[in-house]
Amino acid sequence: MPRVKGGTVTRARRKKVIKLAKGYFGAKRTLYKTAKQQVMKSGQYAFRDRRQRKRDFRKLWITRINAAARNHGMSYSKLMNGLKQADIDINRKMLSEIAISDDKAFGELVEKAKAALK
């Protein structure tokens, strides 16, 4: 029985890895072994950062809401507590968008939160 080296399968597998490494710099793009390692590491970073992105955006929204609330003479935590007591159910993403785009509407929400805290 003749020896089978698996040339086409091996080449296809390596070509796939090199294709995934497109855009990397130097040896990480051209050499199979380092490209494979970098593609694996990139996958780990992507997995981690898909979860991290959610945390980062929540932090950003809270920072924006806090800044806008302090412009209206109230802290973030008091604002959120006041909104909860006033039965205003609005998520942080929408609240931060309102704070950026419509200061008047955000001011009204702050006033309702202040009234609910009294």
Curated annotation (Swiss-Prot):
Keywords from UniProt, A to Z, are: Ribonucleoprotein, Ribosomal protein, RNA-binding, rRNA-binding
What processes does the entry annotate via GO biological process terms?
ribosomal large subunit assembly; translation
Any single GO CC term annotated in Swiss-Prot or TrEMBL for this entry: ribosome
Note whether rRNA-binding occurs among the keywords.
yes
An MF annotation (GO) of this entry:
structural constituent of ribosome
Q: Does the keyword Translocase apply?
A: no
**Gene3D superfamilies in alphabetical order:** 6.10.160.10, Ribosomal protein L20
The free-text function statement in the UniProt record for this protein reads:
Binds directly to 23S ribosomal RNA and is necessary for the in vitro assembly process of the 50S ribosomal subunit. It is not involved in the protein synthesizing functions of that subunit.
Q: Record's family? A: Belongs to the bacterial ribosomal protein bL20 family.
Question: Which HAMAP family does UniProt cross-reference here?
Answer: Ribosomal_bL20
NCBIfam families attached here? rplT_bact
> What name does this protein carry?
Large ribosomal subunit protein bL20
Q: Which organism is it from?
A: Staphylococcus carnosus (strain TM300)
